Amino acid sequence: MMQRRRSMRRMLPGSTAHFDLCHSSSTPRQMSSRFSFDRAYYERHYRDPRTRVGGLGSVQRLGDFVAAYLRYLGQPVRTVIDFGCGLGHWSPVLQQLFPRARYTGVEVSEYLCARYGWERGSVIDWTAARPADLVICHGVLQYLDSRQAHRAIGNLARNCRGALFLEALTKEDWEQNCDRERTDGNVYLRPVAWYRRQLRPLFTPAGGGVFLRPDSPAVLYELETCR
């Protein structure tokens, strides 16, 4: 998750082909070898009101938008997979918005799985028995190198039969849009164009971080897409 600046500047399209790892020049082979998603990480970025990037209130507003948009588009939500579910902020929000939907939280952090009972797994290769109507991947992909992120996007598509909500910190966001004092910058920063290239063969961009699979029943008019 990232904290937006109070006064947002317009995002400019990315044109560079490289990516950066903020504050470090190392390139890990595995996410766990570079990043530690332990208790201290979640205390700083999610629990401490002085340093956290967001809380249940911000997820509630985001969930209200996603739910309203999917209802407008005609995309039913009966099953949800939340990759990188963290403290589980999406769970009560979705329970309120889609009370009959079945929620599955997937998390790579051993600490959080032990505490909250999430499914232990990675967005790179965890696979559900059946694809879900809604897949959430909120602030996860920037912790993966480009090869891992490419695999993860393919895995998101395999686990999704309807809509994907995706948020990832991009190079342009770090330079122009986010509050650097709260946003975790120790991540892989890739230009937004890189993500769009990976997503284009698999999803139709619907705006607002929502992407639709080809087999979604939702109907988009051409000006509603963000091609």
Annotate each language-model stretch with its function.
Residues 136:
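A conserved beta-strand element that flanks and buttresses the S-adenosyl-L-methionine
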Residues 140:
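Hydrophobic adenine-recognition pocket in adenosine-nucleotide-binding enzymes
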Residues 1-10, 15:
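Low-acidity, Ser/Thr- and Arg-rich intrinsically disordered low-complexity segments
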Residues 13, 19-130, 144-227:
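Class I (Rossmann-like) S-adenosyl-L-methionine-dependent methyltransferase catalytic domain
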Residues 133:
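Conserved active-site beta-strand-loop modules that form the wall/rim of enzyme catalytic pockets
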